[in-house]
Amino acid sequence: MASDSGGPGVLSASERDRQYCELCGKMENLLRCGRCRSSFYCCKEHQRQDWKKHKLVCQGGEAPRAQPAPAQPRVAPPPGGAPGAARAGGAARRGDSAAASRVPGPEDAAQARSGPGPAEPGSEDPPLSRSPGPERASLCPAGGGPGEALSPGGGLRPNGQTKPLPALKLALEYIVPCMNKHGICVVDDFLGRETGQQIGDEVRALHDTGKFTDGQLVSQKSDSSKDIRGDQITWIEGKEPGCETIGLLMSSMDDLIRHCSGKLGNYRINGRTKAMVACYPGNGTGYVRHVDNPNGDGRCVTCIYYLNKDWDAKVSGGILRIFPEGKAQFADIEPKFDRLLFFWSDRRNPHEVQPAYATRYAITVWYFDADERARAKVKYLTGEKGVRVELKPNSVSKDV
């Protein structure tokens, strides 16, 4: 791999973005395939599990990636003016989710690579070598100069309006242009304080009655899962006793997505997962950088609703940091109460949850692209094996 300058062993930011475990999407402490040197895995076990598929495309030398990056809009730098004021169609007010960036410097260039050569053809044990440290560098490594800030934030009440926008207007005039331009969209004050409080009460009741279990990985054959993700989760359909307001939240999300139908990239969204209700217990756990859908399992949009009143990230941490592909910038999203977040689920948006030092609740739903979902043969990334819930076209839309 080489940078645009052509120097040997120098990685561009976009090349670093494409380094993730081919099986689970993890982006830290990766091992490189010793044969093609263009695929990565978080452990030997995950490479073995993926070898049957990978060996069909694994070739010696610097083979290019099998699939190019999707030709979708990326997160763009903010327009001229005040730093951090990224707007979608001029409709949204600035969010309070500040983003920071650093520009990688020459010191981040990778050294000449070393490691085992290509494996003998037909080898049953796939070759693997440790990915050099500099190639695992963050998009925003220490030592670089400060860059432009990026704020994907926005509000449910753009331009200082005091009345919430109807769902159709919010979807078409804010969410669609914001997603297609930036790939990230934040809506504040989504359902209102009273409804948000009711959802929080239902989630805490689930937690208090022992409904949560440790977040699962694709493979549980090692003891390192808690080092990767420290949350506890439960899956909710929305019809369970005591989860009526969570069901209302899911219906409200569905309404927004339905209004966006056919306008979010090239996707044809026709279903979603159940809701994953997650809790970080506040003991300093987080979730390392990863990609929700690195292997085309059908998920195209990640939608997260936060439930944390009076959250102060300076004290409690818990920020969701998104590293948009190909950008020397990252977007920091604070998990604030009644905040709704959308972003593309594929490798355009690697992200991490930074350590949380107070109890942190969130509800996540993933929406499916019909065509990609139909092509997906292995359904293992969602934890519920891609449970599909139909979006009923005759659902009565609600203003939110």
Curated annotation (Swiss-Prot):
Q: What free text does the record give on domains? A: The beta(2)beta(3) 'finger-like' loop domain is important for substrate (HIFs' CODD/NODD) selectivity.
Q: Which gene encodes it?
A: Egln1
- S-nitrosocysteine-modified residues are 178, 185, 279, 300, 303
The family database entries (PANTHER family) matched by this protein are listed as:
EGL NINE HOMOLOG 1 (PTHR12907:SF4), EGL NINE HOMOLOG-RELATED (PTHR12907)
* Function description: Cellular oxygen sensor that catalyzes, under normoxic conditions, the post-translational formation of 4-hydroxyproline in hypoxia-inducible factor (HIF) alpha proteins. Hydroxylates a specific proline found in each of the oxygen-dependent degradation (ODD) domains (N-terminal, NODD, and C-terminal, CODD) of HIF1A. Also hydroxylates HIF2A. Has a preference for the CODD site for both HIF1A and HIF1B. Hydroxylated HIFs are then targeted for proteasomal degradation via the von Hippel-Lindau ubiquitination complex.
Q: What is this protein's name?
A: Egl nine homolog 1
Supply the InterPro entries for this chain. Answer: HIF_prolyl_hydroxylases, Oxoglu/Fe-dep_dioxygenase_dom, Pro_4_hyd_alph, Pro_4_hyd_alph_FE2OG_OXY, Znf_MYND
Residues that, per the record, bind Zn(2+) 1: 21, 24, 42, 46
> Which of the residues bear the PTM N-acetylalanine?
2
